């Protein structure tokens, strides 16, 4: 049996505490005796499970988990997620996966030590020019940009994709929705250290002049209709599945949204509502200058430090 991958220098992060428990107690006081059984069932459903997460280097055992998270990002888009997953595993000098912290043998919990709850990595699209999945990603972004943006933005993005002197890195940071955003800070910090080391050692994925990011976002249903609106969505209208990606959005020199309403058929990408307001699932594409990453890291540190 293969040994478990080495731990990354990332802090353990407990899940964020919910505020549902207090609300449930108030509701129970107002319920009739006939509803007690239903309340008990709700209490079980809302029970908080305290799980700690830890980061590990990416290994072959993480293939299924990474591919699943990539499929949630791309949905039905024509991108070979199997090939992309293999590339991320091959270049495991960068990137990390989030797993549950080791559980003692006498624990009653059934834990799959290979189950991943999220990952972070980067694919240098410029270095990988000609690789099928890298070309598919660029073609997808350009096609969606053409559909949702003005011609000038499409031309700008096309020039950047073809500028071999200024590499574009595709930043991937995906996790399940129950993983707290606080884990994003050490994960991104570690990735930046690994990218800097790769650059010094002349390894793949080294220096990136731009970072491309596709973020899972939501907007109130009925908004984001016109082409101009989709390419210039107001930040306060967008809700980010990964809360920290709002800081990347603020520094992006190019950004646009596209709807995935027709492609979404899962819990993480399907029908959403906040305060009884129906939400429309989107993907938000951003291009961030590499020299803005230190400012973004400071923002993450300010808002996500545990």
UniProtKB/Swiss-Prot annotation:
InterPro entries per UniProt: BCP1_family (IPR025602)
Cell compartments where the protein resides: Nucleus; Cytoplasm, Cytoskeleton, Microtubule organizing center, Centrosome, Centriole; Cytoplasm, Cytoskeleton, Spindle pole
Sequence segments annotated as region (Disordered): 1-45
Any single Gene Ontology cellular-component annotation: centrosome
Basic residues compositional bias, start-end: 1-10
Region listing for Interaction with CDKN1A, in residue ranges: 153-251
Biological process terms in GO annotation: DNA repair; microtubule anchoring; microtubule cytoskeleton organization; mitotic spindle assembly; mitotic spindle organization
Main subcellular location: nucleus
Record has Phosphoprotein as a keyword: yes
Phosphoserine: modified positions: 34, 104, 273
The protein's assembly and partners: Interacts with BRCA2, CDKN1A and MTDH/LYRIC. Interacts with DCTN1/p150-glued and ACTR1A/ARP1. Interacts with alpha-, beta- and gamma-tubulins. Interacts with TENT5C; the interaction has no effect on TENT5C poly(A) polymerase function.
PANTHER family: BRCA2 AND CDKN1A INTERACTING PROTEIN, BRCA2 AND CDKN1A-INTERACTING PROTEIN
Protein name, as recorded: BRCA2 and CDKN1A-interacting protein
Species of the source: Bos taurus
Gene: BCCIP
């Amino acid at each position: 049996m293969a040994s478990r991958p080495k731990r990354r220098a990332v802090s353990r992060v407990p899940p964020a505490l919910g505020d549902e428990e207090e609300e449930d107690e108030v509701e129970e006081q107002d319920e009739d005796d006939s509803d007690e059984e239903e309340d008990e069932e709700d209490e079980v459903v809302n029970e908080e499970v305290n799980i700690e997460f830890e980061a590990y280097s990416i290994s072959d055992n993480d293939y299924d988990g990474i591919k699943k998270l990539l499929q949630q990002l791309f949905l039905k888009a024509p991108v070979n997620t199997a090939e992309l997953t293999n590339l991320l595993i091959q270049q495991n000098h960068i990137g990390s996966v989030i797993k549950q912290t080791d559980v003692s043998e006498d624990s009653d919990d059934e834990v799959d030590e290979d189950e991943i709850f999220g990952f972070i990595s980067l694919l240098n699209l410029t270095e990988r020019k000609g690789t099928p999945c890298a070309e598919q990603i660029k073609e997808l972004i350009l096609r969606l940009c053409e559909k949702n943006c003005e011609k000038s933005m499409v031309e700008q993005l096309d020039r950047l994709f073809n500028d071999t002197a200024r590499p574009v890195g595709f930043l991937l940071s995906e996790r399940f929705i129950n993983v707290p955003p606080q884990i994003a800070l050490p994960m991104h910090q570690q990735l930046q250290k690994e990218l800097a080391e790769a650059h010094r050692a002349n390894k793949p994925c080294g220096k990136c002049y731009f970072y491309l990011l596709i973020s899972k976002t939501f907007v109130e249903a009925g908004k984001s209709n016109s082409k101009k609106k989709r390419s210039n969505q107001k930040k306060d209208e967008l809700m980010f599945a990964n809360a920290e990606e709002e800081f990347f959005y603020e520094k992006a020199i190019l950004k646009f949204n596209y709807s995935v309403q027709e492609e979404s058929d899962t819990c993480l990408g399907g029908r959403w509502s906040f305060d009884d307001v129906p939400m429309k699932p989107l993907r938000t594409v951003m291009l961030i200058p590499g020299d803005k990453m230190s400012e973004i890291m400071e923002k993450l540190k300010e808002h996500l430090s545990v």
